[in-house]
Amino acid sequence: LETMPSGIELVDEFISHEGGVPCSTNIMVIGDPGVGKTSILLDTLSSIEKSGRKCLFISGEMGRKQMFKYTKRFKQFGCVTTLFLSDFLEFNSKDVVEQVLSKGFDCVLIDSIAEIVDSVRDDNRWDRKTAESWLVDTCVKNNKGENVEEKFTSFLLIQQVTKAGDFVGSNKLKHMTDAMLEMRKESDRDGGGTYLEFTKNRKMLY
């Protein structure tokens, strides 16, 4: 299975045997707010883009002003092609996402599933289940290369968890992912470090 190395050795070796993000796969990262999910995945995405791959960051969490502040600390993030949903509030978010993804990308980072689903649900007067099913179907469609450039898109999907640390989402959403990574921050008593572990690992990962 072809992979997209980020050039970040620790990340590449952790994600797959071949090193990097495998093509046509969906990797979900869950964890508490502020633990660093966006920073790590944006760093990975920007490195993949520098290697010559066509990448996209779909931001439902941050607007342009927030991203500008972010790039002051992490300059490499400013080079990533980004779709800010907040730029298109007068349009249907479903149509905006579909139109942009139809161009074809090698790797897409979505931050976050909850924000995209809520936006699409509100714009179309759907229930959450219908909006979530639309997102799953859209990802799978692009996994199969059903876009202008026939690229077999991989998705990095950020999702929040409940206060108890449980995954938020339907079984359909859970089943469409090839791997699920949980990101946690240790208490200061335990060293205060951040760690990643696979809670689901199917198809291409160790």
Predicted regions, residues:
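Hydrophobic beta-strand residues in large extracellular and virion-surface proteins
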Residues: 11, 27-29, 55-58, 82, ...
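The Walker A/P-loop phosphate-binding site
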Residues: 1-77
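Helical mechanochemical/support elements of P-loop NTPase systems and associated helical scaffolds
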Residues: 7-10, 40, 63, 92, ...
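Short beta->alpha connector loops
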Residues: 35, 89-90, 161-164
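Phosphate-binding/switch region of NTP-binding enzymes
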Residues: 137-206
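Conserved inter-motif catalytic segment of the P-loop NTP-binding fold
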Residues: 32, 51-134, 141, 151
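Acidic, amphipathic alpha-helical patches
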Residues: 17, 96, 170
